[in-house]
Amino acid sequence: MHGLLLAAAGLLSLPLHVIAHPQPSTNLAGRGVDLDAYRMADRSSYMNSDDMKLKQPGIASLSGGNYVDTATEVVKRMVPGMTFRMVDDHYVGESGISHVYFRQTMHGMDIDNSDFNVNIGKDGKVLSFGHSFYTGPAPDKAPVEKRDFSDPMKAFHGACKALNLPINADKATVQTMNEHEVMFMGTSGAMSDPQGKLCYMAKEDGTLALTWRVETDMGDNWLLSYVDAKETEKVHNVVDYVSHATYQVYRWPIPDPTEGKRETIENPWNLKTSPFTWISDGKTNYTTTRGNNAIAQANFDGGEDYLNNHRPNNKNLKFEYPYAPNMSPKSYIDASVTQLFYSANMVHDLYYMLGFTEKAGNFQVNNHGQGGKGNDFVILNAQDGSGTNNANFATPPDGKPGRMRVYIWTKAKPARDSSFEAGTVIHEYTHGLSNRLTGGPANAGCLNGMESGGMGEGWGDFFATAIRLKPNDNRNANYVHGEWVNNSPKGNRMYPYSTSLQTNPLVYTSCNKYNEVHAIGTVWGSMLYEVLWNLIDKHGKNDGPTPVFENGVPKDGKYLAMKLVMDGMAIQPCKPTFVQARDAIIDADMNLTKGSNRCEIWKAFAKR
């Protein structure tokens, strides 16, 4: 239900931190379009728990009733007179923090990049909140009343032309879904029928634009293009659900084929996190690489179909297939699909233990009454033919399947299959984690800014590195990203992850000279690597495959760091900055351990 209060102009009591970076030249799936030029600004504010006690004591002391009512009262007090709706993805996380999400509205329509998130602690009091609500002048009449917008088909053609999308729409028709949403039927070239939604968008110049949000799933890019509703040749911003990256070898338990031998593992699943096992969805038992959490198959042609693609099948459930690095990739495809399926399910189970559950928006077909939206396992495409020397992960909102494409790497002879590099799968899956947790499960576009997108890459590197740690490692251990797939000891990051400023000199101000998400992500990942070792030095390191908890808190520093970083994702605002994400991790520790690791976390960030 949409509120109908009048929107107020002026400034909110919280400052909006607008972060801008020069734009790199990242092409749109080889079609010569610089998607980074269309990124939204990271314009959220965040009120952490310390600041709130000082600056908003009335909000900090709010409690009573249920957490949804408390969160709604926070929004009403902080943005009086503004209209908004509650998004239907609120939940209580495994750490006891309640997360509630709101979207600003205007004349009954969403302002699509104006969000408010409120975090309620275990004690029922407000822990923190963040927002990016629009505060400028409001249009006096609803555009629907004035019909002051173009035909959606014109906007669709405008998006296709501006972004050079290979979609044929000569015979396309518009099917109305509701007052503000349409579907474009009869097109070809996209992986599903494109959709359109009439909505507002807050621009960087402080004004409001009426737009058609055109959604097109192109495989390597899943785009939300905000086309001006009057001047349909103008595209204001683009959100891409797909995260692209190059990756490193990580241990699960073996990092790559050079560091160990394959072994046969019996029943590797954890029934607490995968109660139907990995090869059932609770309704159907499978004899192939398909189950509740994922479906894995070959995708040699890089196409959209996956259900009918080849996957290994064995009625005795013996997924044992030959592989050697000197074999040609297609000759070991069954081993590749099996490895990819195994690694992705291992990630699912670990992340579930750390808090990425059904109600938090994880990827499962059957949520067996635990909350969230089901029917969204991860589609795992091995040896995907749509590219080489890369991998990507598409994260739509909760209830729609995620999609991981894993490519062949041609930098060695014979070529190398990144399904056998655990870090590739961990990094890619972590894009799904961070996009579902940040801003809530229903909002998968919160990490599309330059700084927030960089953190998305850094989180992927951090989790893969933490999982990769070896028993004898200490804080002097350095980890290079991408040695095996790149066939290079230097990998494909600027510097190794290291606690030495001589080995890795990256600091916060390094971001000023970088304008690409992987470079910025390496800075963020380096900060988190410092947090990791400060907590390990204090609490020790569990070298087992799963965390051990005491009263909901991991007993060791490695898994505690992973837990706090994950909780921070759920606490931080949509489109966070480095500072806001840091504060969210500190607030996560305040909630989980009453701040017992505050000094260790602060020292880690202060160093960088």
UniProtKB/Swiss-Prot annotation:
| Pfam families in UniProt | FTP (PF07504), Peptidase_M36 (PF02128)
Compartments annotated for it: namely: Secreted
Propeptide regions on this chain: 21-244
Report the protein name in the record: Extracellular metalloproteinase 5
Positions annotated as active site in the UniProt record: 428
Gene3D superfamilies, alphabetized: 3.10.170.10, Neutral Protease Domain 2
Tell me the enzyme class: hydrolase
Stated family: Belongs to the peptidase M36 family.
Residues annotated as binding Zn(2+): 427, 431
Q: Cite the GO molecular-function annotations of the record.
A: metalloendopeptidase activity; zinc ion binding
**Which residue positions carry a glycan here?**
285, 591
Signal peptide stretch: 1-20
Q: Which cofactor does it need?
A: Zn(2+)
Query: Which UniProt key words apply to this protein?
Result: Glycoprotein, Hydrolase, Metal-binding, Metalloprotease, Protease, Secreted, Signal, Virulence, Zinc, Zymogen
The EC number(s) given in the record are: 3.4.24.-
Which domain of life does this protein belong to?
Answer: Eukaryota
What is the protein's known function? Secreted metalloproteinase probably acting as a virulence factor.
Principal location class: secreted
Question: Cofactor note, please?
Answer: Binds 1 zinc ion per subunit.
GO biological process, alphabetically ordered: proteolysis
Entry GO CC: extracellular region
